[in-house]
Amino acid sequence: MADDSGTEDVGSGCSGWFLVEAVVDKQTGDVVSEDEDEDAIEDSGYDMVDFINDTVVSEHEELSNAQALLHAQQTCADAVELCELKRKYISPYVSPIQCSEPSVDGDLSPRLHAIKLGGGKKAKRRLFERLEQRDSGYGYSQVETTETQVEEEHGEPEGIEGGSGRAATVETEAVEVLEESSDVIQQLSPRTQVVELFKCKDLNAKLCGKFKELFGVGFHDLVRQFKSDKSTCTDWVYAVFGVNPTIAEGFHTLLKGQALYLHTQWTTCRWGMVLLALCRYKVAKNRETVVRQLAKMLNVPDNQLMVQPPKLQSSAAALFWFRSGMGNGSEVSGTTPEWIAKQTMLEHSFAEAQFSLTQMVQWAYDNGHTDECEIAYYYAQIADIDANAAAFLKSNNQAKYVRDCAAMCKHYRLAEMRRMSMADWIKHRGEKCDEGDWKPIVKLLRYQHIDIIVFLAALKKWLHGIPKKNCICIVGPPDTGKSCFGMSLMHFLQGTIISFVNSCSHFWLQSLVDAKVAMLDDVTSACWAYMDTHMRNLLDGNPTSIDRKHKSLAVIKCPPLLLTSNINIKHDCKYQYLQSRVTVFEFPNPFPFDSNGNAVYELSDANWNSFFKRLASSLELQTTEDEDGETSQAPRFVPGTVVRTL
């Protein structure tokens, strides 16, 4: 195959590029002979016409051009080195490389500027390989120069090799470095909107990994998880990626007016600015509200935000916020949250006390809590102001403490109730109620055609537990107010309710052991038959034995018992043995209501309190008091402090 024109003897003498330039300079109409002696042309020196620049340049101008070129090359080299070494800390939006690239690319050489290597493609791979080697610690002390084989197509050269000089090779490498560094700066630009985040399958894991890389601690080590976006909280921790620096400067000032405490930290990475903040809002907000507010203020999409409430019981998390708030990289405003202060400041550490069950029992007794759920919930609510409650929350035996506290409160309440007489108990219950009006109760009895004198006489014997008068039954048609009357009285006296539905169990009467008064509502024929067979002695008000679950039999005197029924045993002779043991009052009239559906006669605790106070002398409920008045103190179940005198 014949060689292409102008490609012989490549590497010796003039290169192929200069031969092509000589052919182009010929006139269009000139004809080149095939048997032209190429050696003669080389000897004549016509191919070297444009090789030497005969332009007269003054010494001062030549020196100025050299200095300008040297300055441009040094600026380029310094910028590239600075970008490689400190690319993590340099703002990706303003770089000296971007300012110097257009001028340097043209000032290196006018002839070199006309050359396009590889059809205008930029060599990116060499720079990335060099950066990877330097990041890994290898190849940092040597500069690898790899010559690229340039292919020729149709006699048109695409590159320069070998013999055309080392200066062109060095200048070409400088252009490559400039183009590569420009690509790196372009990748660091925030205008890409962190495209890499959208390419990964697990976005949350990618963000958490980048967060730990930047701040040295995992995001989930600082927060607790809220599964629902509707859960409200005053304290929130959020991390935001890809924030514009111009917006980041005024973020703290914008949000400070809405928060009681605000802690912000900013750092940079190849994704842009990254924000970590702890904020205590003036009002509780849910996650949807916080995310919507941050996305609007910082101009970022929702998937670039991680928002969770902070860990309040983690000493490590509290120490992180405390230590980072003392550094120059954080901006803090407002009062430090108490959960940080308690876990980091010495005075709070010294003030921590061990949990005391007696203090918890005293609190439950003073506030009238005997149910386990109420004790656990309300005692946890005062952990901010009570040191013992805070120690209770830190304990791993909270359930055990709650059970023990409820059991002790019930024991104290039961002993207190048994110690009191019926008059003292009614007075004790009346102290917990307001003062009402006794007349609605009397009017209701008159409305039901009950003689007040007879009712008060029976009520006095019933309250004092006189044998054969220890049970009162209210009978009548439905909707006459029998159950309403009895339930209101039981609520005021804090009595217990028993039900015949549990009669199949041997323990259905067990609650009578710990009761001051009791009530059995809606006694049917089966219940009357059961009472006539098994409960005659109980209705008498005499001592009887009650079976208790997991305990031995208890011998008790039946408390005053109130019954309601639609069956009047006075009219049935088969209950003749119960007629002498049960005092019967009949409610014949329907219970009255006004036009709004409210009861005409209000049966409240306040009205019952006024009723017993008004008729205390008739019911013989006077309590014995000293001449100076009552001097008893509230029960105290915590150990006192012994004062030692010198």
From Swiss-Prot:
Residue(s) carrying Phosphoserine: 91, 95, 109
A Gene Ontology molecular function term of the record: ATP hydrolysis activity
Renumbered residue ranges of the record's region Disordered: 138-166
Keyword Lyase: no
Residue ranges of domain SF3 helicase in the record: 450-600
Sequence position, cross-link Glycyl lysine isopeptide (Lys-Gly) (interchain with G-Cter in SUMO): 557
Gene Ontology CC annotations of this record: host cell nucleus
EC numbers, comma separated: 5.6.2.4
Pfam families on file: PPV_E1_C, PPV_E1_DBD, PPV_E1_N
Reaction catalysed by this enzyme: Couples ATP hydrolysis with the unwinding of duplex DNA by translocating in the 3'-5' direction; ATP + H2O = ADP + phosphate + H(+)
Record-listed ATP binding positions: 476-483
Classification via SUPFAM superfamilies: Origin of replication-binding domain, RBD-like, P-loop containing nucleoside triphosphate hydrolases
Post-translational events: Phosphorylated. Sumoylated.
Bias (Acidic residues): 149-159
Positions of short motif Nuclear export signal: 108-117
Cell compartments where the protein resides: Host nucleus
Matches recorded under InterPro entries: Helicase_SF3_DNA-vir, P-loop_NTPase, PPV_DNA_helicase_E1_C, PPV_DNA_helicase_E1_N, PPV_E1_DBD, PPV_E1_DBD_sf, Rep_E1_papillomaV, Znf_lg_T-Ag_D1_dom_sf
GO biological process, one term: DNA replication
Residue ranges annotated as motif Nuclear localization signal: 86-88
Keywords attached to this entry: ATP-binding, DNA replication, DNA-binding, Early protein, Helicase, Host nucleus, Hydrolase, Isomerase, Isopeptide bond, Nucleotide-binding, Phosphoprotein, Ubl conjugation
Stretch list, region DNA-binding region: 186-352
The protein's assembly and partners: Can form hexamers. Interacts with E2 protein; this interaction increases E1 DNA binding specificity. Interacts with host DNA polymerase subunit POLA2. Interacts with host single stranded DNA-binding protein RPA1. Interacts with host TOP1; this interaction stimulates the enzymatic activity of TOP1.
Known function: ATP-dependent DNA 3'-5' helicase required for initiation of viral DNA replication. It forms a complex with the viral E2 protein. The E1-E2 complex binds to the replication origin which contains binding sites for both proteins. During the initial step, a dimer of E1 interacts with a dimer of protein E2 leading to a complex that binds the viral origin of replication with high specificity. Then, a second dimer of E1 displaces the E2 dimer in an ATP-dependent manner to form the E1 tetramer.
Family: Belongs to the papillomaviridae E1 protein family.
Protein name per its UniProtKB record: Replication protein E1
